Amino acid sequence: MIASVRGEVLEVALDHVVIEAAGVGYRVNATPATLATLRQGTEARLITAMIVREDSMTLYGFPDGETRDLFLTLLSVSGVGPRLAMAALAVHDAPALRQVLADGNVAALTRVPGIGKRGAERMVLELRDKVGVAATGGALSTNGHAVRSPVVEALVGLGFAAKQAEEATDTVLAANHDATTSSALRSALSLLGKAR
């Protein structure tokens, strides 16, 4: 497999770049953001994923290994092929897409052309636990984002209204950024029990 390509940029098109390496021109599909960093006549290096099909071998290029790994993770979802995975990475960069998946943000996923509500829900279900999220220093810690969705889902499963569950979970996570899923669930249940 071809893991990376380095060489002179011969052509930059709307959806791909041609990079000459050792006398061979490699056509590498890439997102608009990646293509915008490349200039004809300059040297470039892209981390690649090679997708082999019965009738084709296609290279997809990425600025770093993290983005390539996320692309390959997206392909593990039933119904998500290389084009759809690239579309997702064109709309959301890798850190943002990881955050969207970790948060279970179906609305953000449906902004990707070709991903409907059902497809977005399937992606969240299959990938939420597979994608790690880098620390961001936002209002909620990374742990808070990762813990919030499962706690809210558990509370809704126990019969609480979604709004009630979200408010209780947010209150608990605001007070304790480092709460685990189980401790946050216990605290939220305690809070909701007092409210009843």
Curated annotation (Swiss-Prot):
Residues 139-148 are annotated as: Flexible linker. It comes from the Bacteria. Residues 146-196 are annotated as: Domain III. InterPro entries: DNA_helicase_Holl-junc_RuvA_I, Hlx-hairpin-Hlx_DNA-bd_motif, NA-bd_OB-fold, RuvA, RuvA_2-like, RuvA_C, RuvA_C_sf. GO terms for cellular component: cytoplasm; Holliday junction helicase complex; Holliday junction resolvase complex; plasma membrane. Homotetramer; forms a dimer of tetramers with an internal space large enough to bind the Holliday junction DNA. Forms an RuvA(8)-RuvB(12)-Holliday junction (HJ) complex. HJ DNA is sandwiched between 2 RuvA tetramers; dsDNA enters through RuvA and exits via RuvB. An RuvB hexamer assembles on each DNA strand where it exits the tetramer. Each RuvB hexamer is contacted by two RuvA subunits (via domain III) on 2 adjacent RuvB subunits; this complex drives branch migration. In the full resolvosome a probable DNA-RuvA(4)-RuvB(12)-RuvC(2) complex forms which resolves the HJ. Has three domains with a flexible linker between the domains II and III, and assumes an 'L' shape. The position of domain III with respect to the tetramer is variable. The RuvA-RuvB-RuvC complex processes Holliday junction (HJ) DNA during genetic recombination and DNA repair, while the RuvA-RuvB complex plays an important role in the rescue of blocked DNA replication forks via replication fork reversal (RFR). Binds HJ DNA. RuvA specifically binds to HJ cruciform DNA, conferring on it an open structure. The RuvB hexamer acts as an ATP-dependent pump, pulling dsDNA into and through the RuvAB complex. HJ branch migration allows RuvC to scan DNA until it finds its consensus sequence, where it cleaves and resolves the cruciform DNA. This is Holliday junction branch migration complex subunit RuvA. The gene is ruvA.
